């Protein structure tokens, strides 16, 4: 039976109850892990309030600001993890953003500023968080990120985010190679389309979901819980020989040719 008792898991990217990160946090908690979460700080504190209220049933022992574009804030986050827990076993990276200018129209029209921002938040941040987690994973650990099929194949309106996800998947492999000698495993989950705050920015998300329901072998899209269960598996010792992989949780859509 999957058991994460005694493990400390830090989850980034929870925005609301439709976030895939929320589904992952729930399954890690159910498996016995102690949970910490981050939120994107804003002037009125709305995101912090929302995340605290949502995650209250999980009894998180850490609720921290986590703007990955702010190096000082990232350093402070891991300092707090060290002070509270002393170690870290599981890091969940569920961070992605692209300005609308990078998700509509022609790829050749994407502004340089939008490209840089998307790559920093969606791709570079995995390595940045891994750098902070590395010295805390003294007994090994598991780092898990979320990706999407649009990083491998062209998906309408995914544009800049597809390029960011392609870079993210390669980051998984390079980090796995670097951190493997410390028994730190790094994997990605490529989930099928789910209606989330992030996916709502991508035009035609409902069409994408309906297409998967028609084409995928299971004739449906996946749920937060199914992605969360896969993350819990990858976080556990049951997956101790798996690293550097992208695991598709998409009802089999990825295997279809037509």
From Swiss-Prot:
The protein's Enzyme Commission number: 1.3.1.9
Keywords: Fatty acid biosynthesis, Fatty acid metabolism, Lipid biosynthesis, Lipid metabolism, NAD, Oxidoreductase
Residues forming the catalytic site: 148 (proton acceptor), 158 (proton acceptor)
InterPro entries (alphabetical): Enoyl-ACP_Rdtase_NADH, NAD(P)-bd_dom_sf, SDR_fam
Family matches, as SUPFAM superfamilies: NAD(P)-binding Rossmann-fold domains
Pfam families assigned to the protein according to its UniProt record, in alphabetical order: adh_short_C2
GO molecular function, one term: identical protein binding
Main enzyme class: oxidoreductase
Pathway linked to the protein: Lipid metabolism; fatty acid biosynthesis
Presence of keyword Disulfide bond: no
Binding-site residues, substrate: 98
Reactions accelerated catalytically: a 2,3-saturated acyl-[ACP] + NAD(+) = a (2E)-enoyl-[ACP] + NADH + H(+)
Gene Ontology process terms (BP): fatty acid elongation
Keyword Nucleotide-binding: no
Binding positions (NAD(+)): 13, 19-20, 67-68, 95, 165, 194-198
Highest taxon of the lineage: Bacteria
Record-linked Gene3D superfamilies: Enoyl acyl carrier protein reductase, NAD(P)-binding Rossmann-like Domain
Subunit structure: Homotetramer.
NCBIfam families associated with the record: PRK07370.1
Family to which the UniProt record says this protein belongs: Belongs to the short-chain dehydrogenases/reductases (SDR) family. FabI subfamily.
Function recorded in the entry: Catalyzes the reduction of a carbon-carbon double bond in an enoyl moiety that is covalently linked to an acyl carrier protein (ACP). Involved in the elongation cycle of fatty acid which are used in the lipid metabolism.
Protein name: Enoyl-[acyl-carrier-protein] reductase [NADH] FabI
